[in-house]
Amino acid sequence: MSAVSYSMHRTTTTTSSSSHGGVSAGHAAEEFVASAEREKQEMQQLNSRLEVYISRVRQLEDRNKELVIELDTLRGSLGNDIGQIKFKFNDSLVKVRREISEAHSGTIGVEVKVDRLRDDLNDYRHRYEEARREVEREKTTWGGAISQAQAELDTNKSRYAAILDEEKRLYAEQDQLYLQLAAAKDELDAAIVDRRRLQAEEDDLKIELEFLGRIHSQEITELRTLLAQAPADTREFFKNELALAIREIKAEYDKIIQTTRVDLETIFQSKISAVESSIVSKNEAAVFRQEEIRKMNESITTLRAKLSELEARNSALEREANTLQIQLGEDQRAYESELHKRDNALRFMREDCQTLIAELQALLNTKQTLDTEIAIYRKLVESEEGRFTHVGQGVVVAQQETTRLVPVEQDHWDSGEVQTRSSFKRHAKGNVSIVECDPQGKYIILENTSGSVAEDVSNFEIRRVIDGVQAFVFRLPSHLVIQQHGHLKIYGRNSGGINSPPDSIVMESHPSWGQGGQVETFLYNSHGIEKASHIQTTVASSR
């Protein structure tokens, strides 16, 4: 039996996080780093245990070689003393069985450790999702605050524009009031001019009245003189007539004077009243307008103070918004960096788990091979209690290759020859094919042979037929895509696989894919059309 060499590679990634966001995301990142450190220590311990296990397997291999050499020597030198040989190697077989049992116990411990690591990985994934949701919530909160600040800024800008429009309107109204005040002053000047003109007319009428009085007095004097020069009877006649005429003239003169005076006083009083009422109304309007202007000036001063305050607040809000934008960008970059680091860490952990599972599978295969050899040795020793006839040596171990039968070794003894052969054939219609089916029913591998197109295998069906009887049908989950030159490994529930789409998934409905002499595997698309098949035949013969 040839020696088997094993190598383990462990990649440890230490992540560090820097958060400018909330406290929850930073705390989650610190927990993730601490968990990664704990996982590294656990993986180192697991690595040490696997090294011890591998060294024990190598010791078993060396011991097996020694037993094979001793068995060959005994076969060449002894004939009928097979009972002594059995007695001689009974202790060795018991010891080997015990060591194999201990190795199997170690393997179970490794499987338990792998399950625990899988649970830890799911826990880390859950923590990562919680941290991501926390970051999203904080991003939404900051976005709402920025939107509110932006809305308040827009409101302040609109209020500022309204204040500017109000200021322009007040300035225009002030100019209109100044124009009305100038017009009122012009009307006042015109009223003063009219008053002075009427006073001048009154003075002229008074002078004219005085002049007419002097003329009438002179005429009366002349008439009296004439009356004195006339005879008595004539004088008496004219005296009465003259007195009557004088009374009539005086009455008419007084009437004219009174009428003129009343008219002049009425006109003058009406003019004066109109001018005074106009002046009073204009003064009241001017006072009201001055009061309005004063109030407007005070309002403008207040609005300017508020505007300065709003501008300062606007500047502060803009600075805060810029700071929030910068902080949000830094948080986004830190989040993306942390997400990238965690993706890398998860990918490395997944690769390490895949490596450990592959090595564990190799160890299990080696253990199975050792069990087969020990069973053959036991059967050989028990069957050779009588006469031992050496025919040949070899162990047949059938391993699956791509398209050919693989006989490894053969054992011959007097009871006959046992030989196991496996072969398979496959075909595919399209880019997706069944590239491998584990003979022990642990997994099935699908492959996308295209180098440019990703294949969607959502809701595809895998039908398994074992020894002519359909075992079961498994439907692939939705949203499952195989990338270019990618593989999809589908494990049974108890086959030690991990659920990590799109690289590998676990069939939870059955513990394994089953095994038998004639195993047929078919792949159907979602419309029930056959896309690929894999037929594996295992033949065991003895003679």
Swiss-Prot record:
Region entry Disordered, spans: 1-27
Coil 1B, as annotated region: 89-223
Keyword Mitochondrion: no
Residue span of region Head: 1-42
Region span, Linker 12: 224-240
Molecular function GO terms recorded: structural constituent of cytoskeleton
Region (Coil 1A): 43-74
Family annotation (SMART domains): Filament
Keyword Transmembrane (UniProt): no
IF rod domain mapped to chain residues: 39-388
Keyword entries, A-Z: Coiled coil, Cytoplasm, Intermediate filament
Subcellular location: Cytoplasm
Biased composition (Polar residues): 1-10
Tissue: Expression is restricted to a discrete circumferential subapical layer within the intestinal terminal web (known as the 'endotube'); this layer joins directly to the apical junction complexes that connect adjacent gut cells.
UniProt-listed GO biological process terms: heterochromatin formation; nuclear envelope organization; nuclear migration; nuclear pore localization; protein localization to nuclear envelope
Residue segments, region Linker 1: 75-88
GO cellular component entries: apical cortex; cell junction; cytoplasm; intermediate filament; nuclear envelope; nuclear lamina; terminal web
Location of the region described as Tail in the Swiss-Prot/TrEMBL record: 388-542
Chain segments carrying region Coil 2: 241-387
Family named by the database record: Belongs to the intermediate filament family.
Function according to Swiss-Prot or TrEMBL: Cytoplasmic intermediate filaments provide mechanical strength to cells. Not essential protein. Component of the terminal web (organelle-depleted, intermediate filament-rich layer of cytoplasm that underlies the apical microvilli of polarized epithelial cells) in embryonic through to adult gut cells. Correct localization of filaments requires let-413.
Protein name: Intermediate filament protein ifb-2
Species in which this protein is naturally found: Caenorhabditis elegans
